[in-house]
Swiss-Prot record:
Positions of transmembrane segments: 1-21, 25-45, 59-79, 96-116, 127-147, 149-169, 178-198, 200-220, 237-257, 276-296, 325-345
Keywords: Electron transport, Membrane, Mitochondrion, Mitochondrion inner membrane, NAD, Respiratory chain, Translocase, Transmembrane, Transmembrane helix, Transport, Ubiquinone
Keyword set includes Hydrolase: no
Species for this entry: Natalus tumidirostris (Trinidadian funnel-eared bat)
Molecular function via GO: NADH dehydrogenase (ubiquinone) activity
Job description of the protein: Core subunit of the mitochondrial membrane respiratory chain NADH dehydrogenase (Complex I) which catalyzes electron transfer from NADH through the respiratory chain, using ubiquinone as an electron acceptor. Essential for the catalytic activity and assembly of complex I.
Cleaved signal peptide residues: none
InterPro entries: Complex_I_Subunit_2 (IPR050175), NADH_DH_su2_C (IPR010933), NADH_UbQ_OxRdtase_chain2 (IPR003917), ND/Mrp_TM (IPR001750)
GO terms, biological process: mitochondrial electron transport, NADH to ubiquinone; mitochondrial respiratory chain complex I assembly
Coiled coil regions, renumbered to chain: none
Catalysed reactions, as listed in the record: a ubiquinone + NADH + 5 H(+)(in) = a ubiquinol + NAD(+) + 4 H(+)(out)
Name of the protein in its database record: NADH-ubiquinone oxidoreductase chain 2
EC number: 7.1.1.2
């Protein structure tokens, strides 16, 4: 892609998200969503093949539907309250439709079907943007309207998302689909605590973005897109493979890695609000995600027959300048659990 075009598209994506996050007028928020959606479609189609075109089309149709639902909710709320701005008074029907629209944009169940399909059809770099940056705008609006959200609807969708995120990844061999299902599960954890403690949702989002960015940078570095390529990579660059699998375990929430921190704090927060059944079910469902990450790690490291370096490899490992941030990201993604007592004190 031409550098000028790429820079323009990237600036528009960033601008659209910033407009959504800083606006209090619903029309401006809708414009920001549309700018963001239209700008990212060329990023999804960088490879110019039928699969990426199909992925971009699915993304466009889903996001356009969500935007229409969002405007429908805004119009219903306008007829009842006469307000174009985000206020604490929100019509119940409009609140339900707004929640559905925003969760569709996020990829929560039962509106999650587009996430794995789109992620599988696009390059790793575009998939990174889709699963990290594109979550900021919808989550920021959910954060703003959290006092008016229908709690039962949001908690139900959160629990189903955690379950689907675990079940969906069980039989996957494609790493992009595994990351997509991981994203669905993490979004479920974030939205579960949103109505109780929105700040904790933002902390979870920060940890998720850090871990996912690290994971994708390692996959981009090694050009790995399948579990088989990870197994082959073990023979060529074992250090990078070890780090990749460690980040996977952190994404699954295995103590004492960083990924356990937000899950621990969310379960504690929900329990503090006399909600016992939900965090229990969430913890059980989280074991599904942890299981397929551990199975992948086991299959890659302990069941591969030892081979020599004469094996025909698809790539040659070449360090790149833009990977300078990888070391601090890896440390942050795996070793920040000791900061938990400080965070609990601040809370």
């Amino acid at each position: 892609m031409n550098p000028l075009i790429f820079s323009t598209i990237l600036a528009t994506i960033i601008m659209g998200t910033v407009i959504v996050m800083t606006s209090s007028h619903w029309l401006t928020i809708w414009i920001g969503f549309e700018m963001n959606m239209l700008a990212i479609i060329p990023m999804l189609m960088k490879q110019h093949n039928p699969r990426s075109t199909e992925a971009a089309t699915k993304y466009f149709l889903t996001q356009a539907t969500a935007s229409m639902l969002l405007m429908l909710a805004v119009i219903i709320n306008l007829t009842h309250t006469g307000q174009w701005t985000i206020t604490k008074s929100f019509n119940p029907l409009a609140s339900i439709i707004m929640t559905i629209a925003l969760t569709m944009k996020l990829g929560l169940s039962p509106f999650h079907f587009w996430v794995p399909e789109v992620a599988q059809g696009i390059p790793l770099s575009s998939c990174l943007i889709l699963l990290t940056w594109q979550k900021l705008a919808p989550l920021s609006i959910l954060y703003m309207i959290s006092p008016t959200i229908n709690l039962n609807l949001l908690l139900s969708m959160s629990l189903i998302s955690i379950a689907i995120g675990g079940w969906g990844g069980l039989n996957q061999t494609q790493l992009r689909k595994i990351m997509a299902y991981s994203s669905i599960a993490h979004m479920g954890w974030m939205t579960a605590v949103l109505a109780y403690n929105p700040t904790m949702t933002m902390l979870n989002l920060l940890v998720y973005i850090t871990m996912t960015t690290t994971m994708f940078m390692l996959l981009i570095k090694s050009a790995s897109t399948t579990t088989l390529s990870l197994a082959i990579m073990w023979n060529k660059i074992p250090l990078v493979t070890t780090l990749t699998l460690t980040i996977m375990l952190s994404l699954g929430g295995l103590p004492p890695l960083t990924g356990f921190l937000p899950k621990w704090m969310i379960i504690q927060e929900l329990t503090k609000n006399n909600n016992i059944i939900l965090p229990t079910l969430m913890a059980i469902m989280a074991l599904l995600s942890l299981y397929f990450y551990m199975r992948l790690t086991y299959a890659t490291t302990l069941t591969m027959f030892p081979t020599t370096n004469d094996l025909k490899i698809k790539w040659q490992f070449e360090p790149k300048k833009h990977m300078n941030l990888l070391s601090p990201l890896i440390v942050t993604s795996t070793l920040t659990l000791p900061l938990a007592p400080t965070m609990l004190l601040l809370d």
